[in-house]
């Protein structure tokens, strides 16, 4: 498995083409599985179930309609995006619910290293924080797609993005719960390096090499 880490913001259209090409390579056996860690300039993406009414302001940043699962979400600086391109068949994970559960687990284990108690919320994909009397907020979104059981797209974890940029959408189509970040929780993760190190360790522990 190859790990690719980009320090600078990546062009979104280029990233789609890169993922699609790597998926083809994994399917035909000419390329290795890949976990790609990156970030984008500010933009919005809409998944296959996105409702146009959830896009409240289409003029603020570029909007891309893509083939991943899910609705509208935001990407931008301070958010770590992770795209695992895995052969799920060879890993005996031919079950999207199981795959998403495992991705959530990787994020939960990673965030625990920073003192963030992430959890799942029944009926909603992603990783959430806040329990008891506190309304839960999403700290990590997940939207995936598979082609011949090779996965792509993936995870977006909010470390220190500008959360006001979410105001132009209804994130993931959920009106009753908000979004948060490590920074909003009072936890400074100013360098992606530490997050990446813990994420890789957690990912390998759960998915293997």
UniProtKB/Swiss-Prot annotation:
The keyword Repeat does not apply. It catalyses: octanoyl-[ACP] + L-lysyl-[protein] = N(6)-octanoyl-L-lysyl-[protein] + holo-[ACP] + H(+). Residues 29-209 form the BPL/LPL catalytic domain. InterPro entries: aa-tRNA-synth_II/BPL/LPL (IPR045864), BPL_LPL_catalytic (IPR004143), Octanoyltransferase (IPR000544), Octanoyltransferase_CS (IPR020605). One of its GO terms (biological process) is protein modification process. One of its GO terms (molecular function) is lipoyl(octanoyl) transferase activity. Gene3D superfamilies: Bira Bifunctional Protein, Domain 2 (3.30.930.10). It is an enzyme of class 2 (transferase). The active site is at 172 (acyl-thioester intermediate). Its EC number is 2.3.1.181. Keywords: Acyltransferase, Cytoplasm, Transferase. Substrate binds at residues 68-75, 141-143, 154-156. It is found in: Cytoplasm. CDD domains: LipB. Catalyzes the transfer of endogenously produced octanoic acid from octanoyl-acyl-carrier-protein onto the lipoyl domains of lipoate-dependent enzymes. Lipoyl-ACP can also act as a substrate although octanoyl-ACP is likely to be the physiological substrate. Belongs to the LipB family. In the reaction, the free carboxyl group of octanoic acid is attached via an amide linkage to the epsilon-amino group of a specific lysine residue of lipoyl domains of lipoate-dependent enzymes. PANTHER family: LIPOYLTRANSFERASE 2, MITOCHONDRIAL-RELATED, OCTANOYLTRANSFERASE. This is Octanoyltransferase. The gene is lipB.
